[in-house]
Regions:
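A short, internal acetyl-CoA/4′-phosphopantetheine-binding micro-motif in the GNAT/acyltransferase core
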Residues: 83-93
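Short glycine/proline-centered loop/turn elements that form peptide/ligand docking sites
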Residues: 101, 126-129, 145-152
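Conserved acetyl-CoA-binding loop-helix of GNAT-fold acetyltransferases
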Residues: 93-107
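Short Lys/Arg-rich amphipathic alpha-helical segments
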Residues: 49-50, 91, 106, 112, ...
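Conserved acyl-donor/pantetheine-binding loop and adjacent beta-alpha core of acyl/acetyltransferases
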Residues: 51-84
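Conserved active-site alpha-helix within GNAT-family acetyltransferase domains
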Residues: 109, 115-117, 123-143
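Conserved beta-hairpin
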Residues: 34-56, 63
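Conserved N-terminal entry element of GNAT/NAT acetyltransferase domains
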Residues: 1-15
């Protein structure tokens, strides 16, 4: 579901203070300003147990690997950015992260049917987070190992 005030955010703790703060203080503000949209997983008492945020963006063709560049125009390439992504510590290691990403992928495929969206981008905080995304098929940018991408076309065929 899209985050709204009906969901309890106060007790959410993913172990990362910046992500906790984003959910509790900034996510709804950013939605109100049309900067990002945050989606939540919640339990039967409407406590948020995981979330991700999506925003539109673009990347330069030249930032991508040469194998990707060949088929792309020389203007900015439209993307959807998974900006924030977290699972409460009580639910980590139980597949909640992968379930949230599957949900995000479905939303992104829906968006791609309405507007041009070539890639999903993520900006990983560290190597461990980058490894998580790589296990799901993401690739690192050649010059920025913690910025990763996945083609939307690969999702469309997989979903």
């Amino acid at each position: 579901d899209v985050l709204s005030r009906q969901y309890q955010r106060d007790s959410f703790d993913c172990g990362q203070s910046d992500l906790n703060t984003f959910l509790k203080q900034y996510a709804i503000q950013q939605q109100g300003r049309f900067l990002s949209q945050t989606y939540v997983a919640y339990n039967d008492t409407k406590q948020v147990i995981g979330f991700y945020s999506l925003a539109n963006g673009s990347t330069s063709r030249d930032d991508l690997p040469i194998t990707e560049q060949k088929r792309l125009p020389r203007y900015p390439i439209p993307c959807v950015i998974i900006g924030r992504f977290a699972v409460d510590v009580g639910y980590q290691g139980q597949g909640m992260g992968q379930a949230l990403l599957r949900h995000a992928f479905k939303k992104i495929v829906e968006v791609s049917a309405l507007t041009g969206t070539a890639y999903i981008l993520v900006h990983a905080k560290d190597d461990a987070v980058a490894s998580f995304y790589k296990r799901l098929g993401f690739q690192s940018f050649p010059k920025e190992a913690l910025t990763l991408f996945l083609s939307v076309a690969s999702l469309v065929t997989a979903i």
